[in-house]
Amino acid sequence: MKSKIYFKFTTEKDEIDGVYKDGLNIYKTSNTITNISSDNKKEGITYLDPSKSARCLYRDAKYLRIVRLHKDTVSVKQDYLNDNGRFWADKLYLGKRFELSDPFTIMYMIKMGYNVRERDDYMLEWACAGNFTEVARYLLKIGANPGTNKYACFESAVRNGNYDMVKLLLENIPGSDKFYYKMLEVFKNKSRYCGPEISKLFFNYVRDCDIDYIIRHDTQKLYVLEDTEFVKSLVGRGLGIGKFIDRTEPKFDKYYLECVVRGFLDTMKYFDTIDTTIVTRNQQQLIEKAVLSKNLDVFKYLEQNIDVGPMIDDLILKCMKIDLFVFVKYMIEKYNVINVLDTNKLIENISLCCNMEMIEYMTNLTGISIPETQGLLTNACQYNNSELVKYLLEKGANVNEFNGKPLREAIKNNNKDIIKNLMDYSPDISLDNYAAIRESFATFPEIAKKLAVGISIEKLHEIIFDQKIS
């Protein structure tokens, strides 16, 4: 065995051209290396010259394998045009396997001639993409530049949601305007990958005058408002008075509204302490957003300073539409308005519900019967709510509403339980429900047959194939 050491990078499965084992690896036959394959490329097991191997590091590489050649190994350079230190061999020995995520491995590679700064510090970008934080830390200590490769290091760290990596890179950035504005661009464009903690890191790095510009760029940044202490620090740095802010707009109204939407009650209370008039502006919008937040505690808090009475009818109906039973029950019991609600609107909104608790509560309270509603059963079938379908049928829901649409929806969803309930509870199910016959013919022929009782074979052919028998 020849004594010179070579390298080989392999993936997590320890393979790239094939599956490898410790010790001697032989590629097919010994004469393959001298032949030309069908795609006009030579074949063999790839190995690398350590001093040039940086040119061959690839994104998915996870291990470094130590390679030694057999004494009668036949090998050729893989690419004569690019001197990248890559060779093919018909046989070679694979020795120790090292984790590329270990800084010790990187030190060993450097000792053997590997150039970590090659390809514009590609190894740092590779470490950031692979979440190898300790390797990145070591590379930065020995001079790697996080701004190379078009700042791909930052983009990879942010995309991976790697808090420690982002923090490390921010601690090692050059102090130039060019780099600063590139970081703002990364922060804006990759914000969907930033959780609140990574966003806070960037905000600590952002200049005070840019805080409002960044935080208003998209809704992802607004989740930092949940941390009241962090918001206090932003207010201390000038939140609400930065660049690109309309000076006629109250400083904190937008942020307060976003806290309502997201249910950040503690931060709302903090804003109220520094601007006692904030809740008096846009009252209806604040209440409507509190409903959409589905946070009853936020609604109750706003209610202390906002007269909800004039809006209560619309709010109850809106909550019914979006199945907010907790809100509906709270408002009805507190404001005692059930007798003044429009009965037709109530029936319409009950018909849109798919919440059994809400339906039961409202029908019992108002005296509206299930048969009076139109659409409840169809909605329940559409949303595959078997329990609600059974309840509605027991209460007398019309299985033929909308020309038998409940059955069509159940067939479309392939829900055998609902189909069985519809058929069992309604012996008078419409026999001219052609859409249901068509949709059930291939999947539930027994249902199609039952629905087709009394229909001539010629008419049935026309229904199924949409074509008359000539």
From Swiss-Prot:
Q: Which Gene3D superfamilies match?
A: Ankyrin repeat-containing domain
Any Pfam family matching the protein:
Ank_2
User: Which terms are listed as keywords in the entry?
Assistant: ANK repeat, Repeat
**Mind telling me which SUPFAM superfamilies this protein's record contains?**
Ankyrin repeat
Would the keyword Magnesium be found if you checked this record's keyword annotation?
no
Q: SMART domains of this UniProt entry?
A: ANK
| Cysteines engaged in disulfide bonds, as pairs | none
Q: Which branch of life, at top level? A: Viruses
Spans of the ANK repeats are 119-148, 149-178, 372-401, 403-431
Keyword Repeat attributed: yes
Return the protein name.
Putative ankyrin repeat protein L279
> What's the source species' lineage?
Viruses, Varidnaviria, Bamfordvirae, Nucleocytoviricota, Megaviricetes
